[in-house]
From Swiss-Prot:
Part of the 30S ribosomal subunit. Coiled coil: none annotated. Belongs to the universal ribosomal protein uS3 family. The keyword Plastid applies. SUPFAM superfamilies: Prokaryotic type KH domain (KH-domain type II) (SSF54814), Ribosomal protein S3 C-terminal domain (SSF54821). One of its GO terms (molecular function) is rRNA binding. One of its GO terms (biological process) is translation. Residues 47-119 form the KH type-2 domain. This is Small ribosomal subunit protein uS3c. Keywords: Chloroplast, Plastid, Ribonucleoprotein, Ribosomal protein, RNA-binding, rRNA-binding. It comes from Pinus thunbergii (Japanese black pine).
Length: 217
C-alpha cells in the first residue's frame, strides 16, 4: 500500500528550509509552537478580511517567524504587498502588528513585522490555491479552473505543476478526486525543489480539498 508523506517535511534540510527559527526549553516548546500557529492564522485572517487584491484574494506565499528572548520577528512573503503597505497611508502594517500583539496578550515582548514581495507570485502554490478556491466558490467548472491555474504557473516559467482537487466536484452526489499536470513533477526525488500546499475551500456542496505541487527550476 502506498505511503503518503508531506513533500515539504520530506525535503526539510535538503531543498526546504524551516519556517520557524527559535529554540525553547521543553516545558515551553508546545506553548511557543501554538503561538506560531496563532500568529500565522491572525495574519492570514487580517489580510483576507482587510487587504484584498482586485482578484479578491490575499496572496500570502509563506510566513517566517524568528524568536529571541523578548522579540518576535515575522517576515511575510506576499504576492501583492502594495495593498498592505498603502492601506490607511502606510498604517496597514501597524494595524496588523497591534492585532497580533493583542492576540498574544503579552506586554513584555516586542514584535517586528517585515513585508517582502514575491517576484513571481504564481510560482507559489499557496497563492495559486487561493486563486483556485476563489474560482470554485464562484462555481467556475473545476477543469477550466485547473487549466487556467496551470497556465498562470507556466507563464512564470515553472518546470512542472500538479493540481489535485477532491470532494463533491460540480455538486455530484459521490465525492471523487480529479487532477491535472503540466510539465514534470518527480515526487519521489528528494533533491527536486518541490513546493507544496494543501488548501481546503468551503462551497455550497461541501468542503473541497486542493493540493498543489510545483517543481521550481
Amino acid at each position: 500500500m502506498a505511503q503518503k508523506i508531506n513533500p515539504l517535511g520530506f525535503r526539510l534540510g535538503v531543498t526546504q528550509n524551516e519556517r520557524s527559527h527559535w529554540f525553547a526549553q521543553q516545558r515551553n516548546y508546545s506553548k511557543d509552537l501554538r503561538e506560531d500557529q496563532k500568529i500565522r492564522t491572525c495574519i492570514e485572517n487580517y489580510v483576507r478580511t482587510h487587504i484584498k487584491s482586485s482578484s479578491n484574494y490575499g496572496g500570502i506565499a509563506r510566513v517566517e517567524i524568528r524568536r529571541k528572548i523578548d522579540l518576535i520577528k515575522v517576515k511575510i512573503y506576499i504576492g501583492f504587498p502594495n495593498l498592505l503597505l498603502i492601506e490607511g497611508r502606510g498604517q496597514g502594517i501597524e494595524k496588523l502588528r497591534n492585532d497580533v500583539l493583542n492576540m498574544l496578550d503579552s506586554v513584555d515582548r516586542k514584535l517586528h513585522i517585515a513585508i517582502e514581495k514575491v517576484a513571481k507570485p504564481y510560482r507559489k502554490p499557496n497563492i495559486l490555491a487561493e486563486y483556485i478556491a476563489l474560482q470554485l466558490e464562484k462555481r467556475v467548472p473545476f477543469r477550466k479552473t485547473m487549466k487556467k491555474a496551470i497556465e498562470l504557473a507556466e507563464r512564470e516559467e515553472v518546470e512542472g505543476i500538479q493540481i489535485q482537487i477532491a470532494g463533491r466536484l460540480d455538486g455530484k452526489e459521490i465525492a471523487r478526486v480529479e487532477w491535472d499536470r503540466g510539465g514534470r513533477v518527480p515526487l519521489q526525488t528528494i533533491r527536486a525543489r518541490i513546493d507544496y500546499c494543501y488548501y481546503p475551500v468551503k462551497t455550497i456542496y461541501g468542503v473541497l480539498g486542493i493540493k498543489i505541487w510545483i517543481l521550481e527550476e
